[in-house]
Amino acid sequence: MSLLAIAVVLVGFLSAALSAIAGLGGGTVLIGVLYAIGLHPTVAVPLFSAVQFFSNLSRTLAYLRHVEWRALGWFALTGVPAPFLFAPLVAHADVHWIELVLAALILLSMIPARGGRNPIPQRWSFMLAGLLNGSIGMFVGATGLFVGRLFLRPEWRRETVIGTLAVTQAAGHLLKVLAYASAGFSITERLDWLVPLVIAVIAGTVIGRWFNRLVSEALFARLFKTILIVLSLKLLADGVLGLGGWSWSLF
């Protein structure tokens, strides 16, 4: 494996551990890195979705007894058809616009929600989550940070949020992989990265689940926000300079 591949696999491990601790966020870091190293959406998003399917599946198993299964049914109503409608459009997407959109979504996700919990009725929240996953998610890959807010229910414990978000995200990523395949985009484009990344995210989930109760939430939040800010600034720079016809490389 090249040094770049090793670095990407390490990011996969850390991103899965991050999501196992916080419930979300790790996927945004991973897709941000895949775009930052120059992968086109037709390569980056199918690879990312395949990896995230296993990451979220392992997290679902870790929090299985806390899952609210009705949420998956509402999610599927919009989450099943949407990816197949949007998949053919991915090939025509401009990677630099996607970088800007993803950077904006990352920064917007860090704005505190009013009241801290989601007031939208459950069924509409989960149907909206399915729609966002199958539309915007087909281009930016990661949806956890902005879809995750729809799962912050006042009656749910932290473990229920993590487990239920994980099972819907696993379903969403599987649907995206199938939709990409139907549009002719194969997850085997980077098979040399896929297998080690899958192993890394499963290991990261196990480690993250163990650390879940040990990490200070205040310290974790500061570190997490710092990583996301740096990553979003890199994506913003790449997007703006790319649209302007300039190029640069930080990593």
Where are the regions that the model predicts?
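Interfacial loop-to-transmembrane junctions
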Residues: 69, 206-230
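Interfacial loop-to-helix junctions that mark the boundaries of transmembrane helices
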Residues: 1-3, 38, 90-99, 187-195, ...
